[in-house]
């Protein structure tokens, strides 16, 4: 059983061991597979209901190749059920090692939690981002991560726009995962061959305007190069 951390792991912390069902092959995805062999970029995402996450995963194929040139493997973990992931990625294959974690326990073992939505009547002085927020606060902080939108939009409008653009149809599994973990943060952790975190990025640390964001390709490759020196 993985231990749950209240705060995101930092460089120097030991990464949690995980073993999860693999999406694009039989077997499992495990951090131990890389122990004493090579570093790993572990990317933790929300479920397929999240259009930003779907796009980040699609872009990982390019990043994966560049990280591979630095001797770093790439593993993405999606907060959904195995059969749903296999159904989706069968028609949208990606050249990235994928695992599923429907309870998001791996995310929380890395200290990446979800925020609690409070009533809109909550005194703003009582809100403590990234632990708590209100729907009003989220709607008042428009986003456009990585320029995927024609202009900045609130999260609900952005999600609807991208889902429609992608032709994405929500399933019962997607709806259930969204209900349970819709406010889960995403993250990327570079773990060296010894199992130690060397670099990390966690979504929206500075405020809700960062929702939907992810570490950029250049940032991840630079981190990989840094541990190779």
For each feature predicted by the language model, list its residue ranges.
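N-terminal "domain-start" segment that seeds a small globular fold
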Residues: 1-32
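Catalytic metal- and UDP-sugar-binding loop of GT-A-like glycosyltransferases, i.e.
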Residues: 44, 77, 191
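Short active-site neighborhood of thiol/selenol oxidoreductases, capturing the structured segment around
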Residues: 30-61, 73-74
